[in-house]
Amino acid sequence: MAAFGLVRFQAYGQTPPPTADPYANNADAGKLKFPLAAPAGKDSGAITTAPPGAVNQGMLDPAKWKYGPAYDAPTNSKIWNPVMIKMMKGEKVTGGTVFSTDSPQTYCAMANAGYDFIWTEMQHDARDWDAVGRMWKACPHAKAVPGVRVAYTDEREIQHAMDLGALVIVIPTVRSVEEGKAARDWTMFPPAGKRSQGGGQAFDPDMWGSVPGGYRNTINDNVVLIEMIETLDGAVAAREIAGLAGVTAVFAASGDLGNFSGYKQGTPDYERLINIVHDAALGAGKRLCGPFAWRDRPDFTCFQNASETAAIARGVAAELGPLKDTQGKPEVGPYAPKK
């Protein structure tokens, strides 16, 4: 639908200004000519015959369609997502978790605290996407880029995340290569995927609308896609999932691999599952992610850190040092020691 907004500007050889509104640049009625339109009241035969000069001739066949150059990234375009830059270099990447707040102020404090990206939790928290959009829009160019763990691999979840401006997408409980491929498809624009172009604040010039090369043409190269291996079925398919084009990293889920296997960290059965994910990432040349406690585990280079409430507690402890928890102890009242 948003492609209609390009008509007037393309007719004059201009580029439409970036905007979050997909209809803002619609051409005025009555000013367009349609030299290739079907004749009024007649079947044009377009399903079998292309107009003269068309690249794709013959019967319309999606499997054989030659995708056009309209959305090619500029030649030698540079990556503008700092997390992708670190991922490509194999450097260690940290994601601070925003779990329960919907406060833009708290989000922005986390985003400027020193993490590489913010893991906005949407699988296990009940906040809505409007709240997420407000948080991300409050400080779009903070030190940490906006990221999110969506609830599932469906179009609605991932489309909301991408249209709001996510630069890191985390997909939970990927159980098969089919699920992994679906997640990739909803994350990426054609021809790499199936993401619909429908506007959203990601296109706003105050967010990513003014990036070099344009958001639509460059986001496929910049979005970081992390797929989580959390189940036994996922472990079986881990090599295929890691090998998917467009998947940046696989995540060995420390909690749910225990939950779904019945074994705790450190036991042979549990560690076997983690090593399967490890081997899948190495074999595919992809990054390997896990909890921050595994910062020094071999070959792990991206991590989920604790939540905003845990970060506050750690920060206060570091600031107060020996003065932490030295409150006065009255003998009576609600602050008196419990007997």
Where are these regions (language model features)?
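Conserved anion-binding
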Residues: 168-244
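C-terminal helical cap(s) of enzyme catalytic domains, especially alpha/beta-barrels
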Residues: 135, 177-192, 263, 309-333
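Active-site mouth loops of central-metabolism enzymes
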Residues: 88-104, 147-151, 223-236, 307
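Glycine-rich phosphate-binding active-site loops on the catalytic face of alpha/beta enzymes
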Residues: 168-179, 250-260, 301-320
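Conserved, mostly hydrophobic/aromatic
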Residues: 96, 121, 169, 183, ...
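Catalytic cores of alpha/beta
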Residues: 106, 148, 153-167, 171, ...
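Alpha-helix-loop-beta-strand connector modules within alpha/beta enzyme cores
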Residues: 129-155, 159, 187-193, 218-220, ...
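N-terminal amphipathic alpha-helix/helix-capping segment at the start of soluble metabolic enzymes
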Residues: 30-41, 45-97, 208-221
